[in-house]
């Protein structure tokens, strides 16, 4: 995971704890979770749109592009 070991992750968590305090951590985690959920949703929507665009390509274009390869 990003080339970080266990010690580095523990150090980062301790620094976050010192900066924000124990009371703010649940709020930060909740916000981070929501942000990641929205990011994954947007990513899947983009993938679906790209797949639809590829699937909607007429057969002639697919054949001509595969013949060029």
UniProtKB/Swiss-Prot annotation:
Q: Which GO terms describe its molecular function?
A: protein transmembrane transporter activity
Q: Which family is annotated?
A: Belongs to the TatA/E family.
| Stored PANTHER family | SEC-INDEPENDENT PROTEIN TRANSLOCASE PROTEIN TATA
One of the protein's GO biological processes: protein transport by the Tat complex
Q: Where is the protein situated, by its record's location annotation?
A: Cell inner membrane
InterPro entries xref list: TatA/B/E (IPR003369), TatA/E (IPR006312)
GO cellular component, alphabetical, reads:
TAT protein transport complex
- Describe its partners and assembly state: Forms a complex with TatC.
Chief location bin: membrane
Q: What does this protein do?
A: Part of the twin-arginine translocation (Tat) system that transports large folded proteins containing a characteristic twin-arginine motif in their signal peptide across membranes. TatA could form the protein-conducting channel of the Tat system.
**Does the entry feature the keyword Calcium, yes or no?**
no
Q: Does the keyword Cell inner membrane apply?
A: yes
Sorted UniProt keywords: Cell inner membrane, Cell membrane, Membrane, Protein transport, Translocation, Transmembrane, Transmembrane helix, Transport
What's the protein called, per UniProt? Sec-independent protein translocase protein TatA
Q: Which residues cross the membrane?
A: 1-21
Please name the source species: Chlorobium phaeobacteroides (strain BS1)
Cited Pfam families: TatA_B_E (PF02416)
Q: Tell me how this protein sits in the membrane.
A: Single-pass membrane protein
Which parts of the sequence are annotated with region: Disordered?
A: 48-69
């Amino acid at each position: 995971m990003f080339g970080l070991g266990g010690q580095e992750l523990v150090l980062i968590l301790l620094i976050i704890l010192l900066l924000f305090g124990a009371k703010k951590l649940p709020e930060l985690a909740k916000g981070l979770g929501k942000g990641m959920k929205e990011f994954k949703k947007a990513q899947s929507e983009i993938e679906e749109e790209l797949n639809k665009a590829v699937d909607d390509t007429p057969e002639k274009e697919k054949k001509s592009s595969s013949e060029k390869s």
